[in-house]
Structure formats: C-alpha cells, structure tokens
C-alpha cells in the first residue's frame, strides 16, 4: 500500500545492506523507495526481475524457501548452530522505535470518537482475537493503508498482504479461499463500504458453502478522499457518497450481521461473530466509522 512504519523508515535511512526476498524491487507508488548507494541482494524466481528497476550487487535465482534454507545452512557453517546472537542490540532498537511509533499514533488508536476511528476499530479487533490464531486480510484503498502498519503478523500465513494492486472487493475472495485452506482458523477480511459494493454478494457464497468468515465493513458513507479525484461530480452529484444497511444485506444472504456504533461495543461484537463463524455461518460486522484520511507515510 501507500503506508509504512517508523521502524522501517529509520532502518532504511541507516542501513548499509538490503536483502530482498521474493521481491522485484520494482519502483512504484506502492513500494518503499530504496536508499541510494546501499548494497543490495535479491532473491527471486523471475530472472527478468534482476536489476530491472534497482541495481543489485548480488542475485540468486530460485524459490525463496530453498534459497533461505541454503543461506541458513551457510550461516551455520560459518557461525555455528546458534549463530552469534543479537550482538548489536537490534531487537532492543526496534522495540524502542516501535514504542515511539505507537506513542505517536496512540491518540488515534485510543480515540473515543463517534463515528469511530478506523484505528480504534483495529485496536479493539486485535484485543478481541489472538492474531496468532487468525488469518487476516485487508482490501484496497484506505482500509489497507490504515491496517497495514498496525496489524501484527506473528506467525507465517496469519496475514495476507497485497500491496501492489487496487481492485476493490478482492479481500473477500481471499478470505473465502483462506477459510477453505485453513478451516480451523479465524479468518477476517476488512473492507470499506465501497469495496462491499463491488463484491458483497459473495457473502451468499460463504453462507451456501458454510464458510465461517468474518467480514468487517468500515462504513463511513463515502469513498474516502475521492472528492479530489472527481471534484465536479462530487459537488454536483455527490458521486463519492455511499449509502445502505450492510448488516441487513448480510442477514438476507444468510450471514450473521451486527451494526457497531461505539468502540466499547467492538469486543463483544467480535466475540459473537467468532461464535457464529465456528458454526460455519459467515459473519459481517458493520462498523460505523469516520472518514479518516490520515495515514502513516513513513518510508514513502
């Protein structure tokens, strides 16, 4: 997406080496710019991606898993089975920068505003479930920009990120696939009301197939920031405005549905959605939120 964390930004500014795993190093609005003059190594299974947009000093063509295994084997042969440990205190440095980052965003993450702040919604979601037991994905647009810097990916395959494409509604399909692949997991997709308008009917697919996904819709009544893209249409025809009761829509399609208007309701609503999902019934939580344009643009 278009966002980044303070942690990534600080290390990009001070690093002397970057290892890209499974990346094209493409220059895009959706990727962090690489600092100039820094030695780079690239692992990719697409030969054409080597030196495509960014010059790399070391390249490895191969599957990321296999190359990483080879790197680990070579590291152990040089440094021993347990390596040399965190001799430079990098973990503590990351923790300190993260503390600074979270303090900066604390007012939004702890906001009691009504309509609700998306950041407070995400915080309450994280408190309501164990991210280790979940598979979470976002949608494109502002929901992605807002959740990416803050949702913790604590285990492999617990978070599905897709940052270089912008099709609205794609996250719902990803959630259905994830639930089929890992039915024991709590699968959550976060989408805006515009994204629901593009793909929301697939809630019926989840109901019919007994796929207990949880869809969190951030309903702020608009396509955020689109007045800048279509000022005339926005002024004369309100082309950026959206309306509807997505809770009732979900119920009519066989899902459990609940509308949430206050931050203190989120935890209990999430618990009820999880219980419904365990029976194979998809759940939709319609979060009445504010239009939030502030995003974390560190490293951009």
Locate predicted features:
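Glycine-rich, acidic loop regions that bind phosphate or pyrophosphate groups
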Residues: 1-93, 230, 273
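A short, charged, Gly/Pro-tolerant segment at domain boundaries
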Residues: 90-102, 284-295
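Alpha-helix capping/helix-boundary segments
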Residues: 25-26, 142-143, 222
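Thiamine diphosphate
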Residues: 9-15, 51-53, 59-61, 65-69, ...
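Active-site diphosphate/adenylate-binding microenvironment
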Residues: 96-178
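Structural signal for hydrophobic packing residues in well-ordered secondary-structure cores
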Residues: 16, 22, 68-79, 98-105, ...
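Structural beta-sheet core signal
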Residues: 20, 42, 136-138, 189, ...
């Amino acid at each position: 997406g278009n966002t980044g964390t303070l942690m990534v930004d600080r290390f990009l500014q001070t690093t002397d080496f970057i290892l890209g795993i499974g990346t094209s190093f493409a220059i895009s609005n959706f990727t962090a710019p690489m600092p100039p003059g820094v030695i780079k190594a690239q692992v990719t299974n697409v030969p054409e991606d080597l030196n495509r947009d960014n010059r790399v000093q070391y390249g490895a063509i191969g599957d990321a898993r296999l190359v990483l295994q080879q790197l680990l084997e070579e590291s152990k042969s040089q440094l021993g089975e347990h390596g040399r440990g965190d001799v430079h205190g990098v973990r503590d440095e990351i923790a300190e920068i993260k503390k600074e980052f979270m303090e900066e965003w604390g007012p939004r993450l702890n906001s009691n505003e009504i309509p609700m702040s998306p950041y407070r919604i995400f915080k309450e979601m994280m408190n309501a479930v164990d991210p280790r037991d979940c598979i979470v994905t976002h949608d494109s647009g502002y929901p992605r920009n807002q959740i990416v810097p803050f949702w913790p990916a604590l285990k492999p395959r617990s978070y599905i990120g897709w940052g270089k494409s912008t099709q609205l509604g794609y996250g719902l399909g990803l959630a259905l696939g994830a639930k089929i692949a890992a039915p024991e997991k709590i699968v959550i997709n976060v989408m805006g009301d515009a994204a629901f308008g593009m793909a929301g009917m697939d809630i019926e697919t989840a109901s019919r197939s007994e796929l207990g996904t949880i869809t969190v819709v951030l309903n702020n009544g608009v396509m955020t920031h689109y007045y800048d893209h279509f000022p005339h249409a926005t002024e004369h025809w309100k082309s950026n405005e959206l309306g509807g009761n997505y809770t009732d829509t979900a119920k009519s399609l066989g899902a459990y549905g609940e509308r949430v208007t206050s931050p203190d309701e989120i935890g209990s609503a999430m618990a009820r959605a999880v219980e419904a999902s365990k029976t194979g019934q998809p759940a939709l939580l319609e979060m009445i939120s504010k239009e939030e344009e502030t995003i974390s643009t560190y490293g951009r």
